[in-house]
Amino acid sequence: MQARNIGLDVSVPEKECTDPHCPFHGNLPVRGQVLTGKVISTAMTRSVVVAREYQQYIPKYERKATKIKKYHVHVPDCIELRVGDTVRFAECRKLAKTISFVVVEKVKQ
């Protein structure tokens, strides 16, 4: 099965899969936001938790505070991830109650 073009400038995984929720080998369209974050948990089946850090200015204290936003992200079978990997993930339709993003590329380990 040949990987399809998903419309993003990302590298296609070398491994093939039969996951219907894979943007490359299945029929899941990606749209909207494309974000980058760090994998903090791989305990779920075919899914991971990805954290993004950002700074928010607090006027009362005239300081910036670091905050963390967590995303539940689906991982296709053709992409292998471990805790600590940096990944690029894209928005898609809802796959579960809390999952509406899918991993499209592993940036670095």
Curated annotation (Swiss-Prot):
The molecular function GO annotations come to:
rRNA binding; structural constituent of ribosome
Which controlled-vocabulary keywords does the entry list? Answer: Ribonucleoprotein, Ribosomal protein, RNA-binding, rRNA-binding
The yes or no answer to whether the keyword Ribonucleoprotein is present is yes
Please name one Pfam family that this protein belongs to: Ribosomal_S17
Q: Which InterPro entries match?
A: NA-bd_OB-fold (IPR012340), Ribosomal_uS17 (IPR000266), Ribosomal_uS17_arc/euk (IPR028333), Ribosomal_uS17_archaeal (IPR019978)
Listed GO CC annotations: cytosolic small ribosomal subunit
Q: Does the keyword S-adenosyl-L-methionine apply?
A: no
Per the record, the domain of life is Archaea
User: What does the entry give for GO biological process?
Assistant: translation
Described function: One of the primary rRNA binding proteins, it binds specifically to the 5'-end of 16S ribosomal RNA.
Task: Report quaternary structure and partners.
Answer: Part of the 30S ribosomal subunit.
The UniProt entry's sequence similarity note says:
Belongs to the universal ribosomal protein uS17 family.
> What protein name is recorded for this chain?
Small ribosomal subunit protein uS17
The record lists the organism as Thermoplasma volcanium (strain ATCC 51530 / DSM 4299 / JCM 9571 / NBRC 15438 / GSS1)
The protein's gene is named rps17
